[in-house]
Curated annotation (Swiss-Prot):
Cited InterPro entries: LCL2
Extent of the signal sequence: 1-21
Organism: Ajellomyces capsulatus (strain H143)
Keyword Protease: no
Keywords on record: Signal
A biological process from GO: ERAD pathway
Purpose: Probable component of the endoplasmic reticulum-associated degradation (ERAD) pathway.
Protein name per its UniProtKB record: Long chronological lifespan protein 2
Amino acid sequence: MVHIFTGILLGLLLLATGTQAQFQFFEQMFGGGQQQQHDSREQNVPSDSDWYQRTYDNARCSNYLCPGTLACVAVPHHCPCQHPAVEDKFELGDGSAICVSKGGFKFGEAARKVELARKGLL
């Protein structure tokens, strides 16, 4: 009788522990993560254009200062893309350039698609 009572008590204890672990999991997923979200918001860069304007104004460039990258180049269409790992640069015939997403295409494919679009074929 004592063994049965001990077994039942042990089973209830294990069940309660497992249930508590499940509720902690759901609490963390749906409500307990608020503290983590608060911490990540404190680390974000403030949405303030004053930093960019100060950096732009203090940049020294005797030629053309690219507004997107703050690179100093000879002419505007030589400006590099802001995200070269995921963008291809395509120089247009009028002395300007655009950066387009590579989108998983092979090298040069984005530029080919831009050219097709300019001709009205895409």
